[in-house]
A protein has these predicted regions:
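A short coil-to-beta-strand element that immediately follows conserved catalytic motifs
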Residues: 26, 48-50, 140-146, 420-421
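Mobile, glycine- and charge-enriched loop segments
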Residues: 1-4, 40, 52-91
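Short, well-ordered alpha-helices that flank and scaffold nucleotide-derived cofactor binding pockets
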Residues: 17-21, 42, 100-103, 132, ...
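Class I S-adenosyl-L-methionine
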Residues: 58-66, 81-329
């Protein structure tokens, strides 16, 4: 049993990995970034189309028929005409092109992914229009957002030690005889793959896992430079001093701003200072006043941190009772050096804030970052730079999250899809963990590429002319 899917805004293929592991084969992919498209083609044997606005519009429909449509689309503002919300209100945005494909082909399942801001106050209008449009097109979809992060999914179901909260829009075609486009429904239920799991049980070193790098080239690619090491050494000494001084008590949870350390009697906060900042300034003054002698000694040793850039004269301690800085996972952020326990990592992002593994005194490698997204170790990033690979991974979707969301969507909508359909049998008949399929490199890889070649030979684009 198998099904056909299209992969829009495909990136390097996180959606493809998840749906391919469920037995699906991709009949069309679209990715405008040439570097990401090259990685996609290398791994999946299918060359993505470029600009989706040229492939799906009022005149042309180059996207072939399919059962499932997936995509991590950009969130763009819609017009606010004051009229009835609907598909026309989305015209000029990439969601309109998605809706056009859905209108023409009526795939049984539509699964879209976006950042959490799409359900925030700034985008409430866009969210409402998206839900309304999908319902007008004949789909069951919840107006409540489904927010999923891989670190909340049990490892045996494809979870990963990465906080990556993403919103999924799970829409299922309603057969005409059952159609009630205004009926609300709950979001797909992922409780069975999250139940009983404590994210604090993640062990980054074992569960990712972290590699033991051997070659000089591997080590140099992720090594910290001397300046970065000096920043960490200075703040590590601070942590150890305060650990000895505070005993069993944790270090302060508020941001430590060394530039703003003054005695409480000398504290002067201007009237226009935001409340949150004034609060931190007061707490830093109280902290400095309570520990002035040891802090002055530490500052003197490190030249009052004058050799450090302003953002490195700040520490955000979120590592609870860890003994020192080198036992944590760190990030160099504009707001300071952030330290967390080595359980799970913050979200990979498309900018250079790569996680630093304190125990190994290095950044995570591109292969380790790839594992965070659920991609298998055979995944090939061709000959591109590491910075480009980190960027692509930061823009990507987590395989395990997609895999479990679409399975939960099918279970929620069995009454619409039918238990005997090939789509349902393929998805529900797949292993509970995508790693079990993706790990079998040769068989999975060869089947995916063989199917892509067949589809390319057989498919002739459908042209719509008005």
């Amino acid at each position: 049993m198998t099904f056909k899917f299209v992969d829009l805004f495909a990136g390097i293929g996180g959606f493809h990995a998840a749906l391919g592991a469920m037995g699906g084969h991709c009949v069309y992919a679209s990715e405008i970034d040439k570097d990401a498209a090259r990685v996609y083609q290398r791994n999946w044997g299918l060359k993505p189309d470029g600009d989706i606005t040229l492939a799906a519009n009022d005149v042309t429909m180059d996207v072939p028929p399919h059962d499932v449509l997936v995509g991590g689309f950009p969130c763009q503002p819609f017009s606010k005409s004051g009229k009835q919300m609907g598909m026309e209100e989305t015209r000029g945005t990439l969601f309109w092109n998605i809706a056009k494909i859905v209108e023409v082909h009526k795939p049984q399942i539509v699964l879209l992914e976006n950042v959490q801001n799409i359900v925030g106050p700034r985008h409430i209008h866009e969210w409402q229009v998206i839900i309304h449009t999908l319902r007008q097109l004949g789909y069951r979809v919840s107006e409540k957002p489904l927010v999923v992060s891989p670190h909340l999914i049990r490892p045996e179901f494809g979870g990963r030690p990465q906080v990556r909260n993403r919103v999924f829009i799970a829409a299922t075609l309603i057969p005409k005889g059952k159609r009630d486009i205004n009926a609300d429904v709950d979001v797909p239920n992922l409780e069975s793959v999250m139940m009983g799991w404590d994210p604090q049980k993640w062990n980054l070193e074992k569960d990712l896992p972290l590699d033991k790098l051997k070659s000089k080239s591997e080590k140099s690619a992720v090594a910290l430079n001397e300046t970065e090491i000096s920043w960490i050494e200075a703040w590590n000494e601070f942590v150890e001093i305060m650990r000895e001084r505070l005993g069993e008590n944790n270090l302060p949870g508020f941001p430590i701003w060394a530039d703003d350390w003054v005695h409480t009697k000398d504290l002067n906060i201007s009237y226009d200072t935001p409340d949150w900042k004034a609060n931190f300034l007061r707490k830093n003054a109280e902290f400095y006043t309570a520990h002035k002698t040891v802090l002055d000694r530490w500052l003197k040793k490190w030249n009052h941190l004058q050799d450090f850039p302003p953002s490195r004269r700040k520490l955000e301690w979120q590592a609870q009772n860890e003994k020192n800085l080198w036992s944590t996972v760190m990030h160099f952020r504009p707001s300071g050096i952030r330290a967390k326990r080595a359980t799970y990592l913050p979200a990979l992002v498309a900018i250079t804030q790569t996680s630093i593994v304190g125990k190994q005194k290095r950044r995570i490698s591109t292969r380790e970052a790839s594992r965070l997204q659920g991609l298998p170790d055979w995944f090939d990033f061709v000959d591109q730079s590491d910075s480009l690979t980190y960027k692509q991974l930061g823009n990507g979707v987590n395989v395990g999250a997609v895999y479990n969301v679409i399975r939960a969507q099918v279970i929620r909508d069995l009454d619409l899809l039918g238990e005997e359909s090939a789509l349902v049998k393929s998805i529900l008949g797949a292993p509970s963990n995508p790693d079990l399929v993706l790990g079998a490199h040769s068989k999975f890889h060869e089947l995916a590429q063989e199917q892509a070649r067949k589809d390319e030979e057989e498919y002739l684009p459908l042209r719509i002319v008005k």
